[in-house]
Design a protein with these regions (language model features):
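C-terminal motif of bacterial Sec signal peptides marking the signal peptidase cleavage site
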Residues: 22-25
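Extracytosolic ligand-binding ectodomains
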Residues: 2-11, 27-406
Length: 406
């Protein structure tokens, strides 16, 4: 049986329009009452009126805002659909939306602010480092929390202590899962036996995918001919790419986010490194950052492939006046579905929103439930990670298309 983690232990281990709310950014000393919020106060606020307060947070500004906007839009779309269909047992969902600007400290401030405003459950955060910080804070409140897209294993589970973060779930697959899947695909499906890796050091997402790709590829019998890294803020990768070129790989695994991937692909072409590149879900949004030729024969894994759910895609376009931007929007939608699944169980049990029993009922329902999501039907394993297939995508004329489910 897995241990359930406390806030203290987690801290040690981890080191867009609201339906009835407003969008704000959270400053550490902006004059809000967030820093003095109490669990008792939040319970009273959550239980007031005929609404259920749900927090939705992400980086709506900053260098990863393309992900945050997509997640928040996807989640908000589903919550508004629930409200339009009568809410949950007649209660409307009040959406508390916060911009954490891609910063872990801001993310905790946003979380605490929403607790003070009476949040009953949280959809968020989006990227790994802020999510780790919020998950640590959320444990003290046993706040039901579903991240759409944070992939680090430690968000839900500490492997060193074999401890599950009891109140936290995710709709996406993990860093280890992605690294292992792409190694399997490279070796078993594409037939590559020699691979190199280039990744950003000191970044949870990048290092997590890289480590698991290397371990899995070698366990299958493949050879990692080179591992190159770079630092936050670097924009010139030619030295690393030239070194990789000299090691004669058949493919390069590049588990980085789309803006850096675009630069790396361009510079790889300039130094004569033309072997196929592989990546993780951070590649989602890459189109426009690399040429069609640079994207040819590349592959990456994702939770969702365009065209998989026309009903969702049409609804997103109708709501926001544009096509969904990347696979993070469907994940936001499914994270919201997961939260509502839990809220429905708590409401059906006649519990009072915001109370300890209510929050535990939400958590228990999610842990044992089956979610009919648009990224697939999924359950949760003992680590609170979804059990589902992954989509392998490639690029055709510069656009990502589904190659196969794997």
């Amino acid at each position: 049986m897995k241990n359930m983690i406390s806030r203290r232990n987690f801290l040690a281990a981890a080191g867009v329009v609201a339906a009835a709310g407003v969008l704000t950014a959270c400053g550490g000393s902006s004059g809000t009452a967030a820093s003095t919020a109490s669990a008792a106060g939040s319970t009273a606020a959550a239980a007031s009126g005929d609404t259920i307060k749900v927090g939705v947070m992400g980086p709506l500004s900053g260098n990863v805002s393309v992900y945050g906007q997509a997640v928040v839009n996807g989640a908000t779309l589903y919550l508004k659909q629930v409200n339009a269909n009568g809410g949950i047992n007649g209660k409307q969902i009040e959406i508390l939306t916060e911009d954490e600007q891609g910063d872990a400290t801001q993310a905790v401030n946003c979380f605490t602010k929403m607790v003070d405003e009476g949040m009953t459950a949280l959809i968020g955060d989006v990227t790994t480092t802020p999510t780790l910080a919020v998950a640590a804070e959320s444990a003290d409140y046993n706040m039901p929390m579903v991240t759409a897209s944070a992939t680090a294993e430690a968000v839900t589970y500490d492997a060193e202590t074999d401890t599950v973060n009891a109140n936290v779930f995710r709709a996406t697959f993990t860093d280890p899962f992605q690294g292992i899947k792409m190694a399997d695909y490279a070796y078993q499906k594409l037939g590559y036996t020699k691979a190199a890796v280039i990744f950003k050091k000191g970044a949870d997402y990048n290092e997590g995918l890289a480590e698991n790709f290397v371990n899995e590829f070698e366990s299958l019998g493949g050879t990692i001919v080179d591992q190159e890294s770079y630092s936050e803020g670097d924009v010139d990768f030619k030295t690393q790419l030239t070194t990789i070129l000299g090691k004669d790989p058949e493919t390069v695994f590049c588990p980085n986010y789309y803006e850096e991937v675009g630069q790396i692909l361009s510079q790889a072409e300039s130094v004569g490194l033309t072997v196929p590149f592989l990546g993780g879900d951070g590649w989602d949004g890459l189109e426009g950052y690399a040429t069609n030729d640079q994207l040819k024969d590349t592959y990456f894994c994702a939770n969702y492939a365009k065209g998989s759910n026309p009903e969702f895609e049409d609804a997103y376009k109708a709501e926001y006046g544009q096509e969904y931007p990347n696979g993070f929007a469907p994940l936001g939608y499914d994270a919201a579905k997961t939260v509502v699944y839990g809220l429905q169980a708590a409401e059906d049990a006649g519990l009072e929103a915001g109370t300890d029993d209510y929050k535990q009922a939400v958590i228990d329902a999610i842990a044992s439930g089956t979610i009919d999501g648009i990224t697939g039907t999924f359950t949760f394993d003992e680590h609170h990670d979804p059990v589902k297939q992954t989509a392998i995508l490639t690029y055709v004329d510069g656009k990502p298309v589904l190659k196969e489910m794997f």
